[in-house]
Swiss-Prot record:
Belongs to the GST superfamily. Tau family. Residues 33-114 form the GST N-terminal domain. It is an enzyme of class 2 (transferase). Pfam families: GST_N. May be involved in the conjugation of reduced glutathione to a wide number of exogenous and endogenous hydrophobic electrophiles and have a detoxification role against certain herbicides. This is Glutathione S-transferase U12. It comes from the Eukaryota. Keywords: Detoxification, Nucleus, Stress response, Transferase. Glutathione binds at residues 43-44, 71-72, 85-86, 98-99.
Length: 254
């Protein structure tokens, strides 16, 4: 369904004529060690890192990779020589790669009254289980729908995605205990993890014509997504649905 355009030097937010968000300046944590985050504005995984840094009030420099499809910056290649992907958190002379690894690192390196990961071992295990589910089965099913070659295959794969979303809906209903988020009253590790599907789901809904988040099957996730987008730690970094769709059109030559 979505054919990747290998060479496109017009994928920056400025080129798409989308208003560039201002970098939020946050309070220092008392350390003089430099903190940088390398990301791309439309990357759901970079958004995870930005939300974690915001929640922990970590002052940092955000470095935008403006054209990751055409080429990678020297800083990105040096900081993540194995995968050469965003996000990368640079803390002094240490580079931390992979979004969930970064979220956990931020939570542990800047202790505060607000903990991203739960403190109880059983709840931490629950959070890590669903993080693995999202980055494994759920994203695999999203990618499968996006890459379907025909309508028949797409409908079969859409059923698999809906099953995975139904499982996530059940987890939300059990863990939220009537609150707005997976952890109850405030966003935490599972919310930050699941937040990475908001953009991709919006894009495949737009291109496939299939609604995956539906009031009859995922009412909790629909309300959760609205609350998550509006949260003060998320809103400055989360692109709108229209922005995600416009980016996908450029990226996949649609």
């Amino acid at each position: 369904m979505l054919k990747n355009k290998k060479s496109d030097n017009s994928l920056s937010r400025d080129t798409l004529q989308i208003k560039k968000r201002k970098k939020t300046t946050m309070a220092q944590n008392g350390s003089n060690t430099t903190v940088k985050l390398i990301g791309t504005w439309a990357s759901p995984f970079a958004i995870r890192a930005q939300v974690a840094l915001h929640l922990k009030s970590v002052e940092h420099e955000y470095v935008e990779e403006t054209d990751v499809l055409k080429g990678k910056s020297d800083l990105l290649i040096k900081s993540n020589p194995i995968h050469k992907k965003v996000p990368v958190l640079i803390h002094g002379d240490v580079s931390i790669c992979e979004s969930l690894n970064i979220v956990q690192y931020v939570d542990e390196s800047w202790p505060s009254d607000l903990s991203i990961l739960p403190t109880l071992p059983s709840e931490r295990a629950f959070a890590r289980f669903w993080a693995h589910f999202v980055d494994g089965k759920l994203f695999e099913s999203i990618d499968a729908v996006a890459g379907a070659k025909d309508d028949a295959a797409r409908m079969t794969l859409a059923g698999n995605l809906m099953e995975n979303l139904a499982a996530l809906e059940e987890a939300f209903q059990k863990s939220s205990k009537g609150g707005d988020f997976f952890g109850g009253g405030n966003i935490g590790f599972v919310d930050i993890t699941v937040g990475a599907i908001v953009g991709p789901i919006s894009v495949i809904e737009a291109f496939s014509g299939v609604k995956f988040l539906r009031p009859d099957t995922t009412p909790g996730l629909i309300q959760w997504a609205e609350k998550f987008r509006a949260h003060e730690a998320v809103k400055p970094y989360m692109p709108t649905v229209a922005e995600f769709i416009e980016f996908a059109k450029k990226k996949f030559s649609v």
